[in-house]
Each structure stands twice: as C-alpha cells, then as structure tokens.
Amino acid sequence: MLQLTYDKEEMLIVIDKVVRKTMAMDLTWDWPCGVAYYGVSRAYTKTGNKEYLNMLVQWADEYIELGLPHWTVNTCAMGHMLITLYEETGDQKYWDIVMSKVDYIRNHALRFGDNVLQHTVSVANDFPEQAWADTLFMAAFFLLRVGTKLKDEEMIQDALNQYYWHIKYLQDPSSGFWYHGYNNVKQDHMSGFFWGRANAWGAYTMSQVKIHLKDWYLYPQCMDVECSLRDQLAALKGVQTENGLWRTVLDDEESYEEVSASCGIAAAMINNGNPLHTKYVQKALEGILNHISEDGRVLGVSGGTAVMKDRDGYRNIPKDWIQGWGQGLALAFLSDMLN
C-alpha cells in the first residue's frame, strides 16, 4: 500500500461533485456509460454513500424498462455496474443481464487466432481480426469479475487468455508501452502509436487481476500480467509531465496532456502497490484535481478515439467536452486514493 498524502474530506467532496455531474449526463447504455458507472460504483463501494447506489438503481431500472440494445464488446462494459447492483440489492434481474452479457462474450462475440476477442462497437464486423486495448476493460476484466465470483474456472481461463494475448499483441517489449491496436490480418499495429488511454486500459485492468483473483499465483498467465504491468509502469513513470499527467501520445511532447489516461495510469500505480511509484501518484493527484471543475466536470479528456491513421489524428481529437470515460476513470482513481 502506498503512503499518500491527501485531505480525505476534500477527496469526498470532489468525488461527490463528480458523481452528481456524471449521473446528470443522460448517458446511454454503451461503453461511455459503462466506464462512467463503473466509477460511480467504485465511489459507492469506497464511500458507502447509499445515495450513489440509489441513483444507479433508478437509472438502470428505467433503462431496462425502456429496452436494452444489442450486445457488443463495448456494451458489455455496462456489466461492471450490474455486478455491483446485484451484489448490493440481490435483485435477480441485474444478474440475468450480467449472464446475458457473459453468454454473448463466451458464445457469440467475434474471435480470431487463439480465441482472442475482436473489438466490436456495433453488430457489424467493424474491425476484422483487430485487438484493441479497450477490450480488456469492456469485456476481459468484466469476464474475470464474473468468473471469480462464480468460481467458474473456464470463464477465468477465458478472461486470462484475453489478457495474455492482448499483452502479446499490444505491448512493445523494448519500450514497455502499449500500442492502441493490433491487426491480425496484416500482422501489424496499424499506425503504431503509444496512445495514452490504451495504456490506461491495459495498466488499470492488469492491476485488478491480483485483487479479484486471490490465488492468482496458480495461473501461469498471471505471471505475464505481473511482468507486463511491471515493465509498463516502469516506462510510464518516465513520461509523466511536469504537471503530473500523461500525454495522449505518450512519447510525443507536442501532443496534449490527457486526463482520463492519467487517471487510469495513476490508479494502476495505486493498485499495483510499488512504493517507488508513490511520488508519481502524488504528482498525478495534483494534476488531476486541477482538471476537475467546481461542478464536477473532469476536463482535458479526449473524445472517442479509433486507431487513428497518423500522429495528427491523435493530436487533433478534441478535448473540450466532458466524457463518460473521463468521469468514470477519475472516480476510479479518486476512490482508490481512499485506500
């Protein structure tokens, strides 16, 4: 556990502002909402504020009544919130939807190679045989949470297989950084940039494996997760900016600082628990708090980002609007600070 310095009361006030702004955004059942409400769920778990849980229940019940969309890898991100709702309320309808998403991932989602999940954002075959770092949060981490809860070894193995292959496909062994995506058809990383948020998806989800899988050391793939995260975080500390943040293209000093990536990376450092990272998390806290407005908006968050064609494609993604993933990753980080 890292020994971090912060004002707990101030932290609770900031979390409350971000939660309330997030719940007022009218997000729909897709991955931005999935990440956002994962963050709200974490805030509830860490603070015990029942009002946050009630907000989620009210939103979910209304949306379920209105009708749910088709499942994709991205829409499975909503499963994180549903796990919390089921655990806290015992209402079977939430768990039924969780298991519907699991059934989609296990039996219907597009895969390639050694059973690797293809990243999907719609019911179409959008990105044939492409692995994106995003998939780890939206599907693999979700599958791991359900598998460990049910003690379902096949599900756990499937989740860990996703981690293993995403590490092999996306991590650059020389730098330790992660590429945004991998194209199995062309056997390349497409434009080949180290996108900040991709590294946050990788680092954050890897930092969760030991937390959820108590006997992790009995699974060989977890050694890959442990070493991948070690090398990645060691590299990431070297490109933290003077403001305590990370850039949207990690190794490009002309690309802007991006707050959602910074939140995910700093949260991964907290969860990984290496005391050598204390000063980097402390610095990140200041930088992140400086980008949260009085009304709970997390600022400096890049818009939705495909695997762009060139460096300017990443540099020019707007960061003028609040986003569900920015709100959610900020809440995940701030909630982990309460440890």
Show where each model-derived region lies:
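CBM-like carbohydrate-recognition segments
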Residues: L2-P32, S41-K46, E51, E62, ...
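Aromatic- and glycine-enriched pocket-lining scaffold segments that form the walls
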Residues: V116-Y182
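Inter-helical turn/loop segments and adjacent helix faces that build the functional surface
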Residues: T89, V146-Q157, V209-M223, N272-L276
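Oxyanion-binding "anion nests"
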Residues: A203-L250
